[in-house]
Swiss-Prot record:
It is found in: Mitochondrion inner membrane. It comes from the Eukaryota. One of its GO terms (cellular component) is mitochondrial inner membrane. The keyword Transport does not apply. It is a peripheral membrane protein. Has a dual role in the assembly of mitochondrial ATPase. Acts as a protease that removes N-terminal residues of mitochondrial ATPase CF(0) subunit 6 at the intermembrane space side. Also involved in the correct assembly of the membrane-embedded ATPase CF(0) particle, probably mediating association of subunit 6 with the subunit 9 ring. It is an enzyme of class 3 (hydrolase). This is Mitochondrial inner membrane protease ATP23. Its EC number is 3.4.24.-. Residues 1-46 are annotated as: Disordered. Residues 28-39 have a biased composition (Pro residues). It comes from Chaetomium globosum (strain ATCC 6205 / CBS 148.51 / DSM 1962 / NBRC 6347 / NRRL 1970).
Amino acid sequence: MATPPPPQLSSTSTQPPSPSSASSNPQQPSPPKTQPPLPRFLDNDPARTGYDPTVKWWLNYFRIMTGQVTREGVEHYREDRYKANEARDCARCEADRAYLFAYSPTIRFLRDKVAALNGTLDETNVVCRRCPARVAEDGRVVRQGGGFSPEHGILICANEMRDRSHLEDTLAHEMVHAWDHLRWKVDWSGGGNLRHAACTEIRASMLSGECRWTRETMTRGNWTLTQQFQNCVRMRAIQSVMARPTCRDDVHATKVVNEVWDSCFSDKRPFEEVYR
């Protein structure tokens, strides 16, 4: 399968939107001398988890419903079902992607703004794929809904998309990253300074619609009425920064997000307001 071409780079060299919060503090967080160890992931052991992939799926489903499978086993079961339904999930994702490019006001607006910076986002570099999830030794489940790469474009994790609205939020999030990449010289690697990553994650969570009140209440069960939007954006930005290789821990991620919060949360570009 051919690798999708990257979005074309823009010649714009304006600096990213963090002058007030980032430049006022000359103290840069020093990069860790050694990278934190990579998490170890668990393979399924039927004797430990209760999930046996050699039997019919509905028998495992019954065992899950009757509490005979551990939480880890449920995740391994889910992953195997994703593998079995990969073709169906990717076909549905591609159909929804085509619909959103044709009819979604948010997606069409962002695509036009990316094109204005000499970039291209279409079906050749916005791809739907199955994204494997893994269970770490500490019980954490590592999964993602999508991703952006300056070299390859946008990845949509077809197996994680609940519906077209969820895909719209995910695609808008990654398109904000693409716009930031073309508009500014974003340091995606971290390079000891995670402020670029923190800023673009704040903006993507804020502008994509993934933190709107209806999404938080109906999907995530968060019925908080005060500061719900700000808390959601901050939490998701911290989680994304924590996934960067140069981030030491949650304290480090929180510190970096707080340093750029005021300037990046107030920057609505390329929109005029938060519409979703």
